[in-house]
Amino acid sequence: CFPIKVSHGHVVDMLDKDIDYLFLPSVINMTHASSKVTHSYACPYVQCLPYIIRSAIDLDSQKFKVLQPIIHFEYGESFLDKNLRQIAREAGCRGRRVETAIKMAKETQESFYEQLETRGKDVLDKLGEEDFALVIISRPYNGCDSGVNLDLPEKLRDLGVLAIPMDFLTLDLEDISKDYPNMYWKYGQKILAAARVIARDKRLYALYITNFGCGPDSFISKFFPKEVGGKPFLMIDIDEHSADAGIMTRCEAFLDSLKNARIKEF
């Protein structure tokens, strides 16, 4: 898929830079949003990213050291801390400095999540009853990378449309485990939870960014229309051949059709 191709480009870009370490983790799974969820896996490409990269790029002959840990977020705090200490040892760090760094990292990450929800609540509170916004449904490496998503949120803003990331929504309050007990993709859980939030709020509509060849999305996208409550949404597949003109044409057409849909709703 396109993000994996981009990751190869990022690594190639590092080859000529004066770096000491290249952090290239194998992330197997993520934290659970609910105790009722059995697993929260990353996609197979994310899990095996360092091995895919090594099959295409000679990293052993480089001057820098590759840090290639296997990360299991769902195994709990103590297991994760053990992983992090091992990474630190490979980078030449030990003792109190490492423990302080782990503590600060967790606090900073938690603070960031809280800021996202606070900012999201603030944005939605200011959105009028007859206003609307597009929620960017995506994985973070699509929705948060302006190079990968062709700066789509900013382009929507130029069209006078507010675009917000799905992480602005309080997704942890949505329990999809009853209807999808075997939804073991972490972002599948988040995407379907976001769809339910959108379905309940008449001001929100979805713009789903995916990639050609995305295995998990080929399944998740089949359930999305049902969970979004039958509301119109736009799905855009992006790869290295995508261009501004085609994307903008689809967005403009969707916004035009949305006007008619909203007239019927109101």
Please provide the spans of the model-predicted regions:
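An N-terminal assembly and electron-transfer interface module characteristic of large anaerobic redox
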Residues: 1-266
